[in-house]
C-alpha cells in the first residue's frame, strides 16, 4: 500500500491529502489539533528555503543568461513577452477590483505589521528595501532587498569565468533539489492545513477557495482568449484565432498535464518547426521564453497578493497597484526555476505592503491547495504563449 502511494504523482497525492483533510475536519474535528503540526512544519520549511532560493536562482539566471546575437526577431518577441506579462498582471488587478477575494488565514489578526499609508510610503519602503544589507535581507526574508542584491551580483558575475558560472548553476541546481524535497512533503503539510482550517472555519473556507480559483482561472482564460489574440492581431494583421487555438491545442493541452514549461520545450520547438519558423530563431527564443515569459505566473502572484491585501484590510490606490504589476511581472520571470512555481514568489509582492513572511507563507499554502488546477492552467498559458508570439512575429516578418 505504501509503495503504491509513493509511485503516485505529486498532484494525485495532494488531491488525496485534500480529501483526507476534509474528512478529518468534518468527521473528527476534535482530532485536528494533533495534525496541525504537519502544516506548521511545512510552512516553516517554505519560509526557511524561500529567501536563499530567490537569491541563488536570480544570480545564476542572470550570470548564465546568454542569447545568440544571430537569433532573428529576438527584440520584438522579447517585447511581446514583457508586454504580455504586464497586461496579465494588470488584468489580474482589474479582476480583483471586479471580484474582490478574501482568504481565511490562521491567526491573521494576531500578526503585527505596519501597512503603508500612501504611494509615497510604498516607494520609500521599496527604495529602503533595495539598499538593505544583503545578510539582513536574507535573515529577515526581505525579498525586495534579496531581489535587488541578486540582480546586482548576477550582473557582476556575467563578466566572470565560465567555471564560476558553472559553480553558480550547480548551486542553483542544489537549491532546486532542496526545494524539490520540501515540495515532496506538500501532501502531508496540506493535509494538516486543510484539516485544521476547515475544522475551525467550516464551509466559509471552501467558498473563499472556490472564489479565488475562479478569479485565477477566469483571468487566465481572459488572457489566453482575449488579450493574447489582440496582441497577435496587431502583429500579423489578420484573424489571430486560428493560430491562437492551434497553439492552445498543440502546446497548451500538453503543458496542462506536464505542469512544466521546460518539459514542454520539445513540443513547442516541433510546433514552431511545422509552422515554418527558422530553427536558428526557435532554438534560442523558445527555451528563453520558457524561462522569462510567465504571464500566468504574473496573474497568480498579483491575484494572491491582492487577496491577502483585501483580507488584511489594507487600502491600496491605483498607483500602488501599478507598481505591484511591475513587481509581479519581474518576480514571474523567476518562477520557472522554482519547484513551487509562482507561489513561492508571492512573498516578494506581499513585502510591498509590509505583509509579514508568516502571513505570506500561509497564502502560499492556500495556493498549493488549489494548485492542482491553478498550476496546470498557469503552465498551459505560459507555454502556449511562448510559441504563439514566436510564430506570430515570424509570420509578420515574412509578409
Swiss-Prot record:
Membrane-crossing residue ranges in chain numbering: 8-28, 37-57, 77-97, 134-154, 178-198, 212-232, 284-304, 312-332, 348-370
Keywords attached to this entry: Amino-acid transport, Cell inner membrane, Cell membrane, Membrane, Symport, Transmembrane, Transmembrane helix, Transport
Topology versus the membrane: Multi-pass membrane protein
UniProt record, GO biological process: serine transport; threonine transport
Keyword Membrane: yes
Localization: Cell inner membrane
Disulfide bonds: none
Broad class of where this protein is predominantly found: membrane
Molecular function terms, GO-annotated: amino acid transmembrane transporter activity; symporter activity
Domain of life according to the entry: Bacteria
Family: Belongs to the dicarboxylate/amino acid:cation symporter (DAACS) (TC 2.A.23) family.
Function: Involved in the import of serine and threonine into the cell, with the concomitant import of sodium (symport system).
Protein name, UniProt field: Serine/threonine transporter SstT
Lineage, opening ranks: Bacteria, Pseudomonadati, Pseudomonadota, Gammaproteobacteria, Moraxellales
